[in-house]
């Protein structure tokens, strides 16, 4: 009886692992169907009690695996651009731009996961699938991300994603008007405007 219980437990663990692997494979294959796209988005941030912290909106351009432009237009403008090697963050309000190597950027943020869509990243998560919804929980609890949810159709269109941090703050993004196809290469370059202070951390 004891051997049977142990065997059942082992098989159960194997089945769960296979389900997670299948979900990760399906998620990656769906995202692989669209190599580049543009979409507008709305943002809603709530605290651990569900109280509204911030509402925002902006535009997003992606060309996988490493080119992207995340342009927040409201409530405050900010720009996050990757040219494939350098990651630029620009805040027009304080007139400051920061440059870091993309390879040094954390890969455990929802946007980086979506933009990169690399198997090595997805392997860091336990993934459960319910139709078009994928719920990701980090295997390591050392980071700030507690849970990540993404809704992506079979055609690769991302409808929404959200992230819950360790303090239960939730950031939800609703994507709309996703246009799949070629994106102007200029969207993935950034030149600091004249007079802007540059914090270059690529050293």
From Swiss-Prot:
Pfam families reported in the protein's UniProt record: LolA (PF03548)
Organism listed in the record: Klebsiella pneumoniae subsp. pneumoniae (strain ATCC 700721 / MGH 78578)
Cited InterPro entries: LolA/LolB/LppX, OM_lipoprot_carrier_LolA-like, OM_lipoprot_carrier_LolA_Pbac
Record's keyword terms, sorted: Chaperone, Periplasm, Protein transport, Signal, Transport
Question: Gene Ontology terms, cellular component aspect?
Answer: outer membrane-bounded periplasmic space
Q: What is an annotated GO biological process for this record, any one? A: lipoprotein transport
Q: Which Gene3D superfamilies match?
A: Lipoprotein localisation LolA/LolB/LppX
Query: Subunit structure, briefly?
Result: Monomer.
User: What domain of life does the UniProt record list for this protein's source?
Assistant: Bacteria
- Gene designation: lolA
Q: Which family does it belong to?
A: Belongs to the LolA family.
Disulphide bridges, residue numbers: none
- Specify the signal sequence span: 1-21
Name it. Answer: Outer-membrane lipoprotein carrier protein
Q: What is its main location?
A: periplasm
Give the protein's biological function.
Participates in the translocation of lipoproteins from the inner membrane to the outer membrane. Only forms a complex with a lipoprotein if the residue after the N-terminal Cys is not an aspartate (The Asp acts as a targeting signal to indicate that the lipoprotein should stay in the inner membrane).
Q: Where in the cell is it found?
A: Periplasm
């Amino acid at each position: 009886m004891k051997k049977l219980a142990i065997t059942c437990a082992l098989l159960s663990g194997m089945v769960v692992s296979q389900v997670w692997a299948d979900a990760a494979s399906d998620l990656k294959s769906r995202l692989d169907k669209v190599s580049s796209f543009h979409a507008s988005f709305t943002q809603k941030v709530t605290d651990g009690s569900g109280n509204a912290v911030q509402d925002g909106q902006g535009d997003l351009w992606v060309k996988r695996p490493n080119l992207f432009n995340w342009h927040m237009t409201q409530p405050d403008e900010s720009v996050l651009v990757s040219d494939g090697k350098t990651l630029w963050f620009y805040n027009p309000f304080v007139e400051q731009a920061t440059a870091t190597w993309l390879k040094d950027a954390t890969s455990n943020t929802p946007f980086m996961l979506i933009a990169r869509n690399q198997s090595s990243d997805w392997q860091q998560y336990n993934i459960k699938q319910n139709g078009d919804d994928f719920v990701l929980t980090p295997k390591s609890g050392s980071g700030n991300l507690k849970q990540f949810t993404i809704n992506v159709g079979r055609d690769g269109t991302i409808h929404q994603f959200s992230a819950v941090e360790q303090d239960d703050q939730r950031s939800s993004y609703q994507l709309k008007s996703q246009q799949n196809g070629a994106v102007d290469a200029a969207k993935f370059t950034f030149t600091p405007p004249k007079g802007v202070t540059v914090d270059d951390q690529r050293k």
